[in-house]
């Protein structure tokens, strides 16, 4: 069983990235999904510092409750994998979107960039 399994229904995690400009640790609270041993993170906007930081330095720290692990982040580019991860997030979060930014639930679940974190230490 993956270390993530007991946390699959926890609402949020903290992801700590290294600032691509500052070089300093940056912590961001995010919704997340779990698929086997992979943590799923969706960036709802076209610009997201945590996402850009994770892409610049793929070693990220994830904190869920009192458990801290380090993993490798990657941008999900495979369409089938992206759809499967969107399904995980759609099942977990009953959210209608953000009208102020024009982000719909459909866009967030199935079109926004996804970061997958795995290869845990």
What are these regions (language model features)?
Residues 1-2, 33, 64, 68:
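Generic signal for short, ordered secondary-structure residues
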């Amino acid at each position: 069983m993956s270390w993530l399994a007991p946390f699959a229904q926890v609402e949020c995690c903290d992801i700590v990235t290294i600032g691509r400009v500052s070089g300093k640790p940056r912590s961001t609270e995010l919704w997340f999904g779990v698929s086997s041993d992979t943590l799923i993170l969706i960036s709802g906007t076209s610009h997201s510092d945590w996402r850009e930081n994770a892409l610049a330095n793929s070693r990220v720290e994830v904190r869920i409750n009192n458990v801290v692990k380090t993993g490798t982040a990657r941008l999900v580019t495979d369409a089938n994998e992206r759809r499967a991860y969107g399904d995980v997030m759609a099942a977990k979060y009953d959210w209608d979107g953000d009208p102020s930014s024009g982000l719909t639930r459909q866009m967030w679940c199935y079109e926004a960039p996804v970061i997958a974190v795995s290869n845990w230490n």
